[in-house]
A protein has these predicted regions:
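Short, well-formed alpha-helical segments that are part of the catalytic scaffolds
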Residues: 58-72
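Donor nucleotide-sugar binding loop of glycosyltransferases
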Residues: 59-62, 86, 140
Length: 294
């Protein structure tokens, strides 16, 4: 059974953030158990359009398998694959899949740049809920109904699939050094951001349209730290973030970044958290503009 964890923080002005009538309180954590079969049967999707986005780079070995499991959930209206100048057959495979919109970057724009295209295309396609999942088959698509229903019901505008909840990261093959770095970064970020997330570094996340439209994602990096910056911006709004425990699979063909880029990512995460703290004290910053917290 997936474990649900909810973390939230207060807004910059010190008031309580709200979404769908639910108040978000600082340093609040709640737990609940969800039976996956029950979630599918009673998913409160309210006729909302569910769009899954996949930022892809050299994903020919795992794209089709990920797509098939995504569509097997029977809730997805459209899949958008954005290829970031792959050198393999990712684009050719994507174009053979039904209900898939394919966008190709002629030049590599980076992981963050790819996500910007993903979210813009999803909103342009009329998505009410946007779920990002990597096409490398690291994350299980079977959690899509649970994550989408939590957003559709108005409970949480952002839901993460966490590899840390339930202790599945190491069992799934996460390298020990990455696990230790993940835990250290999360500890520091929670302190600086005033939240209680189990991790900030998952590539499995669902957003409400109303939230995505408010986030200034064009200000964010085109590199991997984009993932961290967008979550910090969600917290800046005072919005609650839900987490669902997600089994992880570290396959040989799955995408990964080397130690050097991981180090740069970690430093970028710390810089983002420090900028957030600076903005809380002095009013606003480049990533956290004044209008975001109004």
């Amino acid at each position: 059974m997936p474990l649900l964890r909810v973390s939230s923080c207060t807004s910059r002005q010190g008031g309580k953030g709200t979404f769908g009538g639910k108040r978000s309180f600082a340093w609040t954590t709640r737990f609940a158990f969800l039976k996956q079969g029950d979630v599918k049967k009673r998913a409160v999707l309210n006729g909302q359009k569910i769009v899954v986005v996949m930022p892809a780079y050299n994903a020919e070995k795992t794209l089709r398998r990920t797509y098939q499991e995504v569509m097997a959930q029977d809730i997805v209206d459209l899949v958008i694959v954005v290829d970031d100048a792959s050198h393999d057959e990712t684009v050719a495979i994507a174009r053979t899949l039904p209900h898939v919109q394919v966008e190709v970057h002629p030049e590599n724009r980076g992981y963050g740049g790819n996500q910007k295209t993903c979210y813009h295309l999803a909103l342009a396609a009329g998505a009410d809920i946007v779920v990002m999942i990597h096409p490398d088959y690291q994350y299980t698509p079977s959690l899509l109904p649970a994550m989408a229903s939590l957003v559709a019901s108005g409970l949480y505008p952002c839901v993460l699939g966490s590899r840390i909840l339930g202790g599945g990261a190491l069992r799934g093959g996460m390298p020990l050094w990455k696990y230790v770095a993940n835990r250290f970064l999360t500890l520091v970020e929670n302190f600086l951001l005033g939240a209680k997330l189990s991790e900030y570094h998952t590539g499995y996340r669902a957003f409400a349209r109303s939230l995505l439209e408010r986030l200034p994602i064009e200000r964010n990096s085109d590199d991997f730290v984009f993932d961290n910056q967008i979550l910090a911006q969600v917290l800046w709004l005072g919005c609650p973030i839900g987490e669902v425990t997600c089994p992880a699979r570290y396959l040989p063909e799955a995408s990964s970044i080397n130690f050097r880029r991981s180090l740069r990512y970690g430093l970028g995460c710390l810089a983002t958290a420090l900028e957030y703290r600076w903005a809380k004290n002095f009013g606003h910053s480049r990533l956290f503009p004044e209008l975001l917290a109004q």
